[in-house]
Every structure is written in structure tokens, then in C-alpha cells.
Design a protein with these regions (language model features):
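Conserved helix/coil segment N-terminal to the catalytic DExD/H
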Residues: 84-120
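Conserved nucleotide-binding/hydrolysis micro-motifs of P-loop NTPases
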Residues: 31-33, 58-61, 104-107, 130-131, ...
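Conserved Walker A/P-loop ATP-binding site and its immediately adjacent core
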Residues: 20-46, 50-63, 103-105
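Interdomain helical connector at the RecA1-RecA2 junction of SF1/SF2 helicase-like NTPases
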Residues: 166-240
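SF2 helicase catalytic motif II
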Residues: 105, 114-156, 160-163
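Substrate-gripping "pore-loop 1 plus following alpha2 helix"
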Residues: 77-82, 117, 131-145, 168-182
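Walker A/P-loop
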Residues: 1-15
Length: 240
């Protein structure tokens, strides 16, 4: 668990290298984040690795906090596949291999591993892992089932761990709905490391935020209207 901006992407790469993982799966919620993570891993890696990206136009996710928005796999700067047979062939090969995939395409990984000759992953990294919580039985929870995606180790990373109250879990159970939170150690394991926002500020890893309050009252607003005072917006639009 690491606050946004403290280096989760590089940390996961270094974990992979320290674990000497030769077969790695990295799951991400959008094409934009997948592209960004692949670029950063390639830039910072201490060893080379072969890459296969698994995604399709149906796996496009909404990602508002990125510098680029990728709406189609045609906009990707690297080859992609959505064929389980190609995934199987890649995983059967030798060398240091990394598959980058969207969560939405993770069932394709599971389909590829139906072939018993396809080895287990040494390591699976589930980024933005809070997306794996909630109701089970969807593409985002495929990674939680060892019988679907076989892996020796799983690492779940997030800045915002999501949990559910005992009352909500009870009500969901009464309705026949399974709800999983990140506090379920049987599924997500124990917290390996936590760097909350406040601690990151203390360490100088993040800049402290400032809250600015601007107080106005009705007479002040009426005066502005009377004088047709111009207001400059962040987009440099003048409004009167």
C-alpha cells in the first residue's frame, strides 16, 4: 500500500527483479496505464525481458489521471494479442518473460493456462488492486482464483485499499452475493508494506498540500454584480 506518486510502478519492477521471476504477469485496469507501466519498466529495468501485451478494444478502461488517453489498441505503440493460443506459446518459451494485460482481458490468460503444459507464473502483480474487490465472478476477480490463473506468488498494490464493513458483508451474504475486501487475508494475504499519504509527506516524498479558503458574503457578490466585476478562470476565460 503506497500513496500515489511514491513509486509503486518502479517498486513492483524491483520486486520482480529481486524475486528473480522469469515469468511475470502484470495486470492493470486500462490501456493507458498499461502503456505507461510498460514504458517505465522498460526504462528502469536492470535486465531485458520479452514482452507480450494482452488486451483488446473491449478492455478499454476509464483513466482520468494520465497524460494520455488511449481509446483503441490501434493507438498502442507495441504489438498486442487477444489470442489464447499465442499467449500459451509465449509462456512455453524460454527466457525472461512479462505479460502486460488489462484486468478485462485476464480471462484470456486463464484460458491460455487451461493447457497444462503452460507453466505457472513465478509472479503476478495486480496494480490498482482495489479494483479486484467487491462482488466476485467478474474479470477483475479472475486473478483471485488460483484455479483460473496459476501463479506461485501474487503481489497486490494500491494507494487506496478497499474494505467492507461486517454489516455490509452480512447483508450481501443474506442476498446470496459474495463480497470480497482487501482485508480478507485468505485471498489478498497480509499487508507487506504500507506508506500512507501522511508518512510520505513526512519523508519528503510528496509535497504537503495547502487548503485555501476564500470567504465571500452576499453584499460582496452583489457589489461585484453591480460593478460587473470580471472573473478570470483557470482556463483564462473572462466571465462577467
Amino acid at each position: 500500500i503506497m500513496a500515489c506518486g511514491t513509486g509503486k510502478t518502479f517498486t513492483t519492477l524491483w520486486v520482480k527483479e529481486r524475486q528473480f521471476a522469469k515469468s511475470t504477469l502484470v495486470l492493470l485496469p486500462s490501456l493507458s496505464l498499461l502503456s505507461q507501466t510498460l514504458r517505465e519498466w522498460t526504462f528502469a529495468a536492470n535486465e531485458t525481458f520479452d514482452v507480450l501485451c494482452v488486451c483488446s478494444d473491449q478492455t478499454v478502461g476509464k483513466q482520468s489521471n494520465t497524460d494520455e488517453i488511449i481509446h483503441s489498441v490501434k493507438d498502442m505503440s507495441f504489438p498486442v494479442t487477444s489470442e489464447p493460443q499465442e499467449i500459451s506459446a509465449f509462456l512455453k518459451g524460454d527466457g525472461n518473460k512479462v505479460i502486460f494485460s488489462t484486468y478485462q482481458s485476464s480471462p484470456l490468460i486463464a484460458e491460455a493456462q487451461i493447457d497444462t503444459l503452460v507453466p505457472d507464473f513465478d509472479l503476478v502483480i495486480a496494480d490498482e488492486a482495489h479494483r479486484c474487490t467487491g462482488t466476485t465472478g467478474n474479470a477483475f476477480t479472475t486473478i483471485l482464483d488460483q484455479s483460473l490463473i496459476r501463479a506461485n506468488k501474487r503481489l497486490f498494490t494500491t494507494a487506496t485499499p478497499r474494505t467492507y464493513s461486517a454489516n455490509l458483508k452480512k447483508k450481501s451474504s443474506e442476498m446470496g452475493v459474495d463480497v470480497t475486501g482487501m482485508d480478507d487475508e485468505a485471498i489478498f494475504g497480509q499487508v507487506l508494506y504500507a506508506l500512507p499519504f501522511g508518512e510520505a509527506i513526512k519523508r519528503g516524498l510528496l509535497t504537503d498540500y495547502q487548503v485555501v479558503l476564500v470567504g465571500v458574503d452576499n453584499p460582496m457578490i452583489a457589489d461585484w454584480i453591480q460593478r460587473r466585476q470580471l472573473i478570470q478562470t483557470d482556463e483564462n476565460n473572462a466571465v462577467d
